[in-house]
C-alpha cells in the first residue's frame, strides 16, 4: 500500500477554537484570549462561516468571505487575528504527511475527520499486521501500541528510517503510565525510542536493584520469550484520555497549536499517570549505549 502526499498550501489560515453566543440582539464572540460584543452583521456571517470550517483554510477563501460581507479584507483579518479567531501560517511543516500505525487501528477510526478541525491531517490509519506498508518521504509516523514489544519498533524503524524526511513518534503503556516519546528524526539526529526506554529501564534497575519483580526484569523476560507487554486494565475512559493526548501532541507538532512551542518540546517525552491523571514532560537526551547516532 503506497500512501499519497497530502500537502498544505502556502498562505494558509488557522481557524482557532471559538464560540458565538447570541440572545435577542446581543451577539458575543468568545475565544481563548478575548470576549467581544459583535454588532456588525457582516462579521457575524463571517464568523458563522468560519465556525463551520474550523481547521486550516486558504487565505483566498477568507478574503472571499470578507468580500461577500462587504468587509475590508485587511481590517477584517486584523480584527480576527487580534481577537484570537485566526492566525496565519506561511512556514512549511516539517512533515507533509502523518500516518498512524497501531495494533488497535479501530481506536482511530474517526480521527481523520475529527482532528481536521484542529489542523491535524492524518493521511492513513494502518494496522500493524499489514505487511505491505509504504510511506512517502517527509512523513511523521506515529506508532501506537497497546501490546508493547521493542521488536515492533525496530521493525518499523528499519523499514522506513532511510526514507528522506521521515520521523517517528511512539506511544505505549508501561505500568500505570501512558507514555509518548519525543520525535525521533534520523535527519535531525534526535534521540530514538530506545534512548527513552533504556534510560527508563536504567532508572528502574537502580531503584529496584536486582529485584525479580521489577518492570525492567519483566521487560527483559518478555523480550527473551518473544512476548508482548499488554496494557493494564484499559477501559474506554483510559483509551479516551490517551486518544486525546495523542491528538494534542500531533496538534502541537503538525497542526494548529494552541500554545507557543519551544524546541525542547520537540524532543520531550510525555508521561501520563492513568490513576492520578498527572502529566509530566521531560526532555530526553541520547542514551550512551544506543546506536541511533550511528545509523
Swiss-Prot record:
GO terms for biological process: antibiotic biosynthetic process. InterPro entries: McbB (IPR030956). One of its GO terms (cellular component) is cytoplasm. It is found in: Cytoplasm. Keywords: Antibiotic biosynthesis, Cytoplasm, Plasmid. The keyword Ubl conjugation does not apply. Necessary to process the inactive microcin B17 (McbA) precursor into the active peptide. This is Microcin B17-processing protein McbB. It comes from Escherichia coli. The lineage of its organism: Bacteria, Pseudomonadati, Pseudomonadota, Gammaproteobacteria, Enterobacterales.
Amino acid at each position: 500500500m503506497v500512501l499519497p502526499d497530502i500537502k498544505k498550501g502556502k498562505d494558509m489560515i488557522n481557524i482557532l477554537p471559538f464560540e458565538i453566543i447570541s440572545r435577542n440582539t446581543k451577539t458575543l464572540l468568545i475565544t481563548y484570549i478575548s470576549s467581544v460584543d459583535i454588532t456588525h452583521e457582516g462579521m457575524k456571517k463571517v464568523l458563522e462561516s468560519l465556525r463551520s470550517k474550523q481547521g486550516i483554510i486558504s487565505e483566498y477563501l477568507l478574503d472571499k468571505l470578507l468580500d461577500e460581507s462587504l468587509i475590508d479584507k485587511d481590517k477584517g483579518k486584523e480584527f480576527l487575528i487580534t481577537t484570537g479567531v485566526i492566525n496565519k501560517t506561511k512556514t512549511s511543516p516539517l512533515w507533509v504527511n502523518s500516518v498512524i500505525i497501531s495494533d488497535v487501528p479501530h481506536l482511530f477510526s474517526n480521527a481523520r475527520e475529527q482532528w481536521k478541525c484542529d489542523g491535524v491531517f492524518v493521511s492513513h490509519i494502518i494496522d500493524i499486521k499489514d505487511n505491505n506498508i509504504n510511506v512517502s518521504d517527509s512523513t511523521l509516523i506515529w506508532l501506537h501500541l497497546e501490546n508493547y514489544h521493542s521488536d515492533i519498533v525496530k521493525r518499523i524503524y528499519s523499514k522506513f528510517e532511510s526514507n528522506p524526511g521521515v520521523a517517528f513518534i511512539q506511544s505505549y503503556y508501561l505500568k500505570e503510565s501512558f507514555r509518548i516519546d519525543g520525535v525521533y528524526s534520523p535527519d535531525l539526529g534526535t534521540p530514538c525510542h530506545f534512548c527513552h526506554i533504556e534510560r527508563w529501564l536504567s532508572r528502574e534497575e537502580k531503584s529496584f536493584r536486582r529485584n525479580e519483580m521489577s518492570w525492567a526484569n519483566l521487560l527483559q523476560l518478555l523480550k527473551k520469550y518473544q512476548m508482548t507487554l499488554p496494557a493494564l486494565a484499559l477501559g474506554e475512559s483510559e483509551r479516551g484520555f490517551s486518544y486525546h493526548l495523542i491528538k494534542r501532541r500531533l496538534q502541537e507538532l503538525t497542526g494548529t497549536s494552541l500554545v507557543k512551542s519551544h524546541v525542547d518540546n520537540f524532543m520531550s517525552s510525555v508521561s501520563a499517570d492513568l490513576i492520578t491523571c498527572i502529566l509530566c514532560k521531560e526532555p530526553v537526551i541520547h542514551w550512551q549505549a544506543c546506536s541511533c547516532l550511528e545509523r
